[in-house]
Regions:
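Aromatic-lined carbohydrate-binding surfaces of glycoside hydrolases
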Residues: 10-228, 258-271
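N-terminal carbohydrate-binding accessory modules
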Residues: 1-8
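Substrate-binding groove of N-acetylhexosamine-processing glycoside hydrolases
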Residues: 27, 77-80, 129-137, 141, ...
């Protein structure tokens, strides 16, 4: 299968708002991405970018956040490494929805569409466009030689709700869709006037339900290129029937977006690779049937989300998803086959251990001595998932429910014969958890900043440690009782 049939761009999306890797990780990863068939990066910095001047509070230059983002020198290094590897960079900066990283700050709280929610910016506030253009100006000026800019604009959860927007929508021929399109047009016109060489990409989801006439009358096709995103596997893949005819009549240039991670669960730890492969196979079919309708299909972004929003917990860490990314790129170029699977497996170091694309029953054997950057973290996460299964099996066991439930403990109505066997189980789990934490901390320090490691440990390991310690102490206290009711 000739990949060039479906556009010349194959962009790997790096969502840096969750677990941004250190620069040395990119030095190892970027050459591989080029080898696997990627042509560029869709770089979503969010709050890890070193914004300055009036925007200093939202980025990595603010003192309290220095450890979780990039310095100017590090950000430049990332761009340099990408360039050296022949990877074009397309920066992505949110300009409408998913604005939590800006609107959470007191300085810009007044720009929220709904005062208590920091997600969406108000398109009617006179200070909104100056803020958005300031974000764009700093991003564009930092990225030399870019040809495209992605301005996000997806999932605008709150639109047309403030008093001014409500009146504007009521007075408009097309209501809320006009509010959305007018904001995008204002941004796009600023970019065209200031950076006439830049082509502008937007996520397409807010456009899907809009009538052809609305899109046509706003001349949106003159200014932006939609990136159609759909991340589900074949069984749940569904785009509107009219999307290709409608978009091709409005937009001369169209993109697609698949997913290699961050799309099968908001707190997923390891990608369900089968689902991601299926997503890419279905996209290939979708494009095969419809791409001839499009004047020019630009290419595809392989998205890898790190958080579902700014406040969400981290989902799959990038090293755990490298096998999924490698296979999805291969599938995009050649289709899925046993031969493709084996080629990718061998290149990643799955020699003595099978390369599973279907989730395994846990606990499961863990591979070792793999060949991709960060494999040590990836197998550490496998260990964590194995451990979590053992932990849940223990704390939800019949033995605890039958002989040490809260009522029994509160009333000192426990059987010491049954409790004695629990102490070794809790002790063993705590010892293994300590080993797991030690291993993961060492391996993560090679790739991640301390702030991220602390968050991951605090989210995933600390609650289990607290619960096990509490259960062990409760058991010991019950065993010390000399009399029982």
């Amino acid at each position: 299968m000739d990949a060039l049939t479906f556009g010349s761009h194959r962009l790997v999306h790096l969502d840096l708002k969750g677990a941004p890797p250190r620069v040395n990780y990119f030095e190892k990863l970027f050459p591989l991405l080029r080898t696997w068939g990627a042509t560029g990066l869709l770089l979503e910095w969010e709050d890890t970018f070193p914004y300055n001047r009036e925007l200093t509070p939202i980025g990595s230059n603010r003192p309290i956040n220095l450890a979780s983002g990039y310095t100017v020198q590090e950000a430049r290094q990332i761009l340099q490494i990408a360039g050296d590897c022949g990877l074009a960079v397309i920066p992505l900066v949110q300009t409408f929805g998913h604005m939590e990283f800006v609107l959470k700050h007191d300085e810009w709280r007044s720009l929220r569409e709904v005062e208590r929610f920091p997600s969406s910016i108000c398109p009617s506030n006179p200070q909104t466009l100056p803020l958005v253009t300031s974000l764009i100006r700093q991003i564009v000026n930092f990225h030399p030689d870019i040809q495209y800019l992605h301005i996000g604009a997806d999932e605008v959860w709150h639109l047309g709700l403030c008093s001014v927007c409500t009146k504007r929508a009521a007075a408009s021929k097309y209501g809320k869709p006009s509010l959305y399109l007018e904001h995008i047009l204002a941004i796009a016109q600023y970019i065209q006037e200031t950076y006439p060489y830049l082509k502008i990409i937007v996520w397409d989801d807010m456009l899907r339900s809009m009538d052809f006439q609305v899109l046509k009358e706003h001349y949106i096709g003159k200014y932006v290129e939609p990136m159609i995103w759909h991340y589900n596997s074949r069984d749940n893949f569904s785009l509107p029937q009219d999307i290709w005819d409608k978009y091709s009549a409005v937009f001369p240039h169209i993109w697609a977006a698949t997913a290699f991670k961050g799309a099968t669960g908001s707190c997923q730890h390891i990608p369900i690779i089968r689902n991601h492969v299926s997503n890419h196979e279905k996209w290939l079919e979708e494009l095969g049937a419809n791409v001839n309708k499009v004047h020019e299909f630009r290419g595809t972004a392989f998205t890898g989300w790190s958080r579902y929003d700014h406040y969400a917990t981290m989902c799959e860490l990038l090293p755990t998803a490298i096998p999924s990314l490698a296979l999805c790129l291969k599938v995009w170029l050649h289709g899925y086959s046993e031969q493709t699977h084996m080629q990718v497996a061998n290149s990643l170091g799955y020699i003595d251990h099978p390369f599973h694309i279907i989730p395994q029953l846990r606990p499961a054997p863990i591979p070792n001595n793999l060949l991709f950057p960060g494999w040590q973290v990836a197998v550490g996460i496998e260990w964590f998932i194995n451990f979590r299964t053992k932990y849940h099996n223990t704390i939800t066991s019949e033995q605890i429910s039958t002989w040490m439930n809260p009522w029994q403990v509160a009333n000192n109505n426990t059987n010491p014969m049954q409790l004695e066997s629990l102490i070794p189980a809790f002790t063993d789990l705590l010892l293994e958890l300590s080993s797991l934490e030690g291993y993961l901390r060492v391996q993560m320090e090679n790739i991640y900043f301390p702030y991220m490691i602390d968050e991951w440990m605090g989210t995933n390991l600390q609650p289990m440690k607290v619960k096990l310690t509490e259960l062990k102490e409760t058991t010991e206290n019950q065993l010390k009782l000399s009399t029982r009711v």
